[in-house]
Regions:
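Macrodomain-like recognition of ADP-ribose-binding/processing modules
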Residues: 1-153
Length: 153
């Protein structure tokens, strides 16, 4: 909700501080004041050309997140937020395209190739959803996510 640095600052500059204020109000009401990494929501921007913002944090405060699956988690959450939005939206209010920044590449210091791998994996898993939930699948997904070069054991 603190949209005053990096890509967030550019978003606030473009849409105005009213958007940041509404994002913060949503976080206060829906997340008791702290939106966890790995969650996301869609909010109206008030701009007809760019009608929605998906708020999907990659960190609570600025810090290095290289070596984690945070980029995957934030991307996955953003995709799920769009999916949820589209399930209940009227046809003319559905989100049909999304622009993502290189999540975690700024102050998070995740290398661009790792960002791309984690975001691509989230997308591929989203468009090819699992058909069962079991330990084999969970272990496989974990191995997929941490096979990106962002993971440094």
């Amino acid at each position: 909700g603190l949209m005053d640095g990096g890509v967030d600052a550019a978003i606030t500059a473009f849409f105005g501080t009213q958007l940041q204020a509404r994002v913060q109000q949503h976080i206060l009401h829906e997340y008791c004041g702290e939106q966890p990494v790995g969650t996301a929501f869609v909010i109206d921007t008030g701009d007809s050309e760019h009608p929605y913002l998906i708020h999907a944090p990659t960190m609570r405060v600025p810090k290095v997140i290289n070596g984690s699956d945070t980029v995957y988690q934030a991307t996955w959450a953003a995709l799920l937020a769009v999916h949820s939005h589209n399930q209940s939206a009227a046809d003319d209010n559905k989100i049909r395209s999304v622009v993502f920044p290189a999540m975690g590449a700024g102050c998070g210091q995740v290398p661009f190739d790792s960002v791309a791998k984690q975001m691509k994996l989230a997308w591929l898993n989203f468009i090819n959803p699992v058909t069962r939930i079991d330990w084999s699948h969970a272990s496989s997904r974990e191995a997929q996510v941490f096979s990106t070069s962002a993971y440094c054991p």
